[in-house]
Amino acid sequence: MHIANKHFIVSGAASGLGAATAQMLVEAGAKVMLVDLNAQAVEAKARELGDNARFAVADISDEQAAQSAVDAAVSAFGSLHGLVNCAGIVGAEKVLGKQGPHGLASFTKVINVNLIGSFNLLRLAAAAMAEGAADESGERGVIINTASIAAYDGQIGQAAYAASKGAIASLTLP
C-alpha cells in the first residue's frame, strides 16, 4: 500500500511505538487519527504532528469508545485505509509471588487492553475500511497489529503481557 494520501488510525499513539508510527505515517503523507487513553499526551502529540493529525481519546477495550474513534477518523478524513494497533500495557506480576497468586483483576486488565482492545478496534476499523472503495490495486485497507518477543518467549513476572501478545500474534497470523 502506498501511504501518501491514505487515512490511518494508530492506537497507543500518545507515546512510544504508537507515537513513532503516527509520526512516520504523517511524514509519509498520510492523515492519521491518533487514539489513546491519555488525553493530554495524545492531544499534544497530534498538535506536534500538525494538520494531518487528529486525535481521539478512547479506551479501545470499550466498544462505544472504540466505535467513536473510528467514526471520528472517517468523519475527519472521509474514509479509512489502515489501522496500526500499538496500544498496550504491561503488568509485572508473577503467577505465584511472595504475596501469593497473581491477581485475577490485574491479569484481566492487561488482557482487556492488549487483546480485547486490539481486537475491538480491529473489527470496527475493518468494517469501516470495507465500506470504502478499493484503490487501483484492489486494496481497501491494511491492519497491522504489534506484538512483542514476549509472544514467543514469555518473560518472568509478565504472564498477562506474554499471554496477550501471544494471542495478538495468533490473531494476526491467519
Which role does the model predict for each range below?
Residues 154-162, 171-174:
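Active-site loop-to-helix junction immediately N-terminal to the catalytic Tyr of the SDR YXXXK motif
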Residues 39-40, 57-69, 104:
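The beta1-alpha1 cofactor-binding region of Rossmann-like NAD(H)/NADP(H)-dependent oxidoreductases
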Residues 90-108, 131-137, 157-160:
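Conserved mid-core segment of classical short-chain dehydrogenase/reductases
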Residues 148:
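Residue(s) in the substrate-gating loop at a strand-loop-helix junction
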Residues 122, 164:
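Active-site helix of classical SDR
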Residues 2-33:
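Canonical Rossmann dinucleotide-binding motif of NAD(H)/NADP(H)-dependent dehydrogenases/reductases
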Residues 28-44:
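Conserved glycine-rich Rossmann-like NAD(P)H-binding loop of the short-chain dehydrogenase/reductase
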